[in-house]
Amino acid sequence: MPNIDDLIRDKLSKDGQVLNLKAQFLREVGAKELSKREELKEVRAMDLSQNGIGDEGVKAIAESTVFVNLRNLNLA
């Protein structure tokens, strides 16, 4: 799994509202890690497609208190 800190720094928009992590090999563990990151509270759109995050990864994102502003999530 890639370094989550580096990915957030490189892939989060300047306004903190869009996170594009398409095809970054995150898997379930990466999705769970993202779901704990307080610095992502302003994210409104996130692309996690082609990451193989699985059911548990999706559950972690869905139940996360971090992503309260999330309105658009791509998992395809």
Segments (PLM) and residue ranges:
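Short, solvent-exposed loop/turn at the beta-strand->alpha-helix junction
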Residues: M1-I4, Q24-K32, G52-K59
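Extended, small-residue-rich solenoid/repeat segments and analogous flexible loops
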Residues: M1-K14, N20-A23
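Short secondary-structure capping/turn segments at boundaries of alpha-helices and beta-strands
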Residues: L7-I8, E33-S35
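Inter-repeat linker/turn residues at the boundaries of leucine-rich repeats
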Residues: K14, E38-K41, T65-V68
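Conserved hydrophobic beta-strand positions in leucine-rich repeat
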Residues: L19-L21, V43-L48, R71-L75
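Core hydrophobic positions of leucine-rich repeats
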Residues: L34, L48, I61-A62
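A generic tandem-repeat structural signature
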Residues: K59-A76
